Design a protein with these regions (language model features):
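Catalytic center-proximal scaffold of phosphoryl-transfer enzymes
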Residues: 1-435
Length: 435
């Protein structure tokens, strides 16, 4: 129960209401920590078996199409064994990987060559860019002062991203949902059929599992690869690895998933294209048409055309070698866009990904992080560093995996005794008396 609801306090109330069991918040958190530590140990043993080549798959048949997406979250931590209260608060990055089997069909032609309607709406794209920039700015501020404002803005941006992503990639088949994903049209019967037909090409999620940890990206790689191997992802005919441009994502992909198609989440280059177009166009009236043209080029796999125009502008607006430019300077904005797009150009062949029936956004992992944050983040909520963070991540992750009821199955099958606490070796009756 403590993995499903917002806090241990809520879990205690639910348990009391539904069962004759009485348990304190502190005792429930002790049990959660114990189970979380054991789940982390089991995950690490699985990773070690994969590295040693002894890990056996647990599914009968390999899937046809799969996607792995990784990203980083943020968890507020505190010093461990420092007494009551929050001591030495610090935001730390959690690593999260989402592994999905997909229901999709390859196609000989690009099933959706035109830019989705939402990316042709200036107010929508402008709001998206502002929200993503707010996440970065407020995230840095929160890291310095321990404020949770960054999480509030992140949730707002996530809500917008969810309205922009292709709905079938989130497992949503309702043609009335996420209307921003298509050009706005009257809700006639004909247009409903048209929207449904346009969505048929998008890959649909079948089964999702996930891996999360507070470890480094180097340590995270084998944990994700082990989960993928257990589900026979490496044997799939079509394989995708999605990320948002963070360097560690592509290092992990190159080391542990070299045969997977690396795909840059389409939403993130949109922010660089939007800001650079406002600089290059020279006027507000010309900026938006240029942005749409560049976004269309990226959507059609022609990022080289965008890079060429950016380089031409940069050549005609040189920067003095000894001058430090402000972040708001147009030359700085164009340079950042050039760097980002050139570094990721090889991961932006979106027409080919769509022909293969693969997703082109990393919304799957962004939505997963939001589900994890429901339990892990909140006002005045901090976790012991590092054990408390790792434990709560594991129990929350166990209830979010869709291949089985992982948490219940583990608790019901774990070795142990009703009379002894494994961590202390004391008799349960002695602990009750001492308490």
């Amino acid at each position: 129960m403590n993995a499903h609801v917002k806090s241990a306090g809520v879990a205690v109330k639910v348990i009391k209401k539904l069962t004759p069991i009485t348990v304190s918040e502190s005792h429930l958190m002790e049990l959660t920590a114990t189970i979380g530590e054991e789940l982390a140990e089991a995950r690490d043993r699985q990773a070690a078996q994969y590295v040693q080549g002894t890990l056996e798959p647990e599914v009968k048949e390999p899937p046809q199409a799969v996607a792995v997406a990784s990203d980083g979250g943020r968890v507020l931590t505190r010093a461990e064994e420092a007494g009551r209260g929050v001591h030495d608060p610090a935001w730390k990055e959690s690593k999260v990987a989402c592994l999905e089997t997909l229901n999709s069909q390859p196609s000989e032609v690009d099933p959706h060559p035109e830019l989705p309607g939402c990316f042709a709406e200036e107010d929508v794209v402008g709001k998206l860019v502002r929200e993503i920039k707010s996440i970065r700015k407020e995230g840095d501020q929160a890291s310095n002062d321990g404020d949770d404002e960054g999480d509030r803005i992140s949730k707002e941006a996530q809500s917008l991203l969810n309205s922009l992503v292709l709905p079938a990639e989130s497992g949503d088949d309702d043609p009335s949902d996420h209307e921003l994903a298509e050009v706005r049209e009257p809700k006639t019967k004909t247009n409903r059929k048209k929207r449904r037909k346009n969505k048929d090409w998008r890959p649909k999620r079948r089964v999702r599992t996930s891996v999360c940890s507070m470890c480094s990206s180097d340590e995270f790689g084998p944990k994700v690869a082990a989960e993928a191997s257990r589900r026979r992802f490496f044997e799939a005919a079509r394989r995708a690895f999605l990320g948002d441009g963070l360097p560690w994502n592509w290092t992990l992909q190159a080391r542990w998933f070299p045969d997977f198609e690396p795909i840059l989440d389409f939403v993130h280059p949109t922010t660089y294209v939007y800001e650079a177009s406002r600089v290059v166009a020279g006027s507000d009236a010309k900026a938006w048409p240029l942005c749409v043209r560049w976004l269309q080029a990226c959507w059609q796999g022609q990022v080289s055309l965008v890079l060429e125009e950016l380089r031409d502008w940069q050549a005609s607006h040189p920067s003095p070698p000894d001058e430090k430019l402000a972040d708001t300077d147009g030359r700085t904005i164009v340079k950042k866009a050039l760097t980002y797009l050139s570094h990721n150009a090889s991961r932006m062949d979106y027409p080919r990904y769509r022909r293969l029936g693969l997703p082109v956004t990393s919304s799957m992992v962004e939505s997963l992080i939001k589900e994890i944050n429901y339990r892990v983040k909140g006002s005045e909520k901090s976790w012991n560093r590092p054990s408390g963070c790792e434990s709560i991540l594991q129990v929350r992750n166990a209830v979010l995996c869709e291949d089985a009821d992982r948490l219940s199955d583990y608790i019901l099958s774990r070795p142990g005794s009703a009379y002894y606490r494994p961590s202390t070796g004391k008799r349960a009756s002695e602990e009750i008396t001492a308490a």
